[in-house]
Amino acid sequence: MKLLFLFFICLSFQITAQNVSEFSIGDRIIMDSEILDEERILNVYLPYGYSPDSTKTYPVIYLLDGSAHEDFIHVAGLVQFGSYSWINIVPESIVVGIENVSRNRDFTGETRNSLHKDAYPEMGGSANFIQYLDSEVFAYIDDNYNTTDERTIIGQSLGGLLATEILLKQPQMFNNYIIISPSLWFDYESYLDIEMKQTQEKLKIYVGVGDEGKIMKNAAKKLHKKLKKELKENDQLSWGYFKDNDHGDVLHFAVYDAFEHFFNQEK
């Protein structure tokens, strides 16, 4: 009995004596934004083998709703998995997740809907947020990491609304747009009336939606139809409908599908 007791004591000591260290998949950047006049956080996933001393460069995927408790972890996992040589649906990429402070403010433009104005008085800050992306976030990432000129944006719901606004007004900001379940009901679907600004760069655009109700599905279809008419001949437009997924889980499946549409043909 004493021997058994001593065995468990020794086993317990061995377990507690193991070294424990922090597990990290990238960097957490705290930056002061002059444009937004507030502190913002960026989460950065780096590909396996990334070295700041290497001459190898990587495309960058910018993820809205990019905190650890939102979409950063699972999207970074998709990028890691999809870039394995035996999967090869997306190139090795840096993922930049932009943590939210107020998505109602940052992802929406002005609205004529008085109910929304009263309920969410902070709405209407998308122009400042887009400037923050274009002037501060891009500059920081390009100055501190080994990046190429290729940029992808991923946005869902209100994030999809913002990605749509950028696509229509400043399409040169990104090469690839993954727009999932965009909240185009906002401001009486006025974004669908914006004439898309043209850019010389080739664009790849993916619009996806799940089984999320008539309003959301119809708005996504209208956006896809609008883009078919307004995109250049050499632009690429893809569509995804996920009947078995709803607003809560469609992003994960749609992003994987978008990667296959965008990059799988480049194998």
Could you tell me what each predicted segment is?
Residues 17-59:
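A domain-start/cap signature at the N-terminus of enzymes
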Residues 206-208, 213-267:
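C-terminal catalytic histidine-bearing segment of alpha/beta-hydrolase fold enzymes
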Residues 67-130:
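Active-site machinery of serine-nucleophile hydrolases
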Residues 1-21:
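Bacterial Sec-dependent N-terminal signal peptides
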Residues 155-159, 163:
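Gly/Ala-rich beta-loop-alpha elbow adjacent to hydrolase catalytic centers
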Residues 145-156, 177:
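Alpha/beta-hydrolase fold nucleophile elbow
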Residues 131-149:
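Conserved acidic catalytic loop of the alpha/beta-hydrolase fold
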Residues 100, 178-186, 211-212:
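Active-site nucleophile loop of the alpha/beta-hydrolase fold
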